Amino acid sequence: MTGRAFLTGATGFVGSHVARALCNAGWRVKALVRRSGNPRQLGIGDLPVEIVPGDLSAHTDLADAVSGSDAIVHVAGLVRARTLDDYREGNVLATVRLLRAAHQRAPDALVVLVSSQAAAGPARDGRQVCEGDVARPVSGYGLSKREGEEAVEREWKGP
């Protein structure tokens, strides 16, 4: 499958690698980049990526940006914050805004959320954590990432 992919977090470590992989696979990539970001300095300057200035706090930015996307890959996330509410703003509410914009402008898109091991919490009794295990995050970051996963499960009614 190839087509038009909308990517958040493209200037971060994981996101820049996702951008490169999408481009190498033949996707046309549109990346949401904070107005303060410089893609040339952030790992994607050499890629044929369409840069869309904006952020996840503005629904209008998102609705226009996701329009016509075949896939939405949400890598962006808040890793450091002072309070749980700040984490929730960056990792839950931003995700919900993105999903609602997608419902309006790209309802048939494939949605991929990149989360974190922190959402599951640490392994217990020396065994691997599996998808079906009960999540037991131990930090505000992990809790907010788990809540972001739950938001996708609850909010996304795509194809």
Where do the protein language model's features map onto the residues?
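SDR active-site strand-loop-helix element
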Residues: 8, 32, 72-76, 111-117
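N-terminal Rossmann-fold cofactor-binding loop
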Residues: 32-37, 55-56
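NAD(P)H-binding glycine-rich loop region in Rossmannoid oxidoreductase-like domains
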Residues: 53-93, 101, 119-120
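Conserved internal alpha-helix in NAD(P)-dependent oxidoreductase domains
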Residues: 89-96, 132, 143, 147
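Active-site Tyr-X1-5-Lys
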Residues: 138-159
